[in-house]
Amino acid sequence: MHAYLRLFKKKLSADELKLTERDARRCVILAIKAVDVINFEELLDLQAIKQLSGANEEVLKLLNLFTTTDAKGFEAQINKFAKLMKEEGLTKEELIVKKSYVQICSLSTDVTNFAYSDLAKLLNIDEDEIENWAIDAIQNKIIDAKIDQQKEEIVIKSHMLRELKKKEWQSI
């Protein structure tokens, strides 16, 4: 999918943009559905994605929601996209989990130990659900982590990086 998306990087004329709009919309939806696609900033940099308008503008707004809100804000606003979710076969629960993966991958790699309570607050989920969430995230290869039940913390060794910033490059 990423190779296909790179086709949208070049400068496109207005006519070419109209032709690629349907494909750009589809790529955004597929990226949202794909568990292992976390770097939405890369998508938002593509001209064809930036140019989504009209009926497809909702898709762009949903994509932006993943990168511009925290987990609590995301949950508060997700219902605005009910029609789009129904059209594309997206569920609120899937989108909330996806947002939690995007959120966890934005954490600094300098800190590795996270108390259940801190993660619950960050991800806007119940503290009782943190272990199950971590198990799912580990199985989906979003994070490489260990669960320390005694200390009630998740030790995150690494996570998928959304976008390598100077700080991340230095820590590598």
Describe each model-derived feature in a short phrase.
Residues 2-172:
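Charged, E/D/K/R/S-rich low-complexity terminal regions of large eukaryotic assembly subunits
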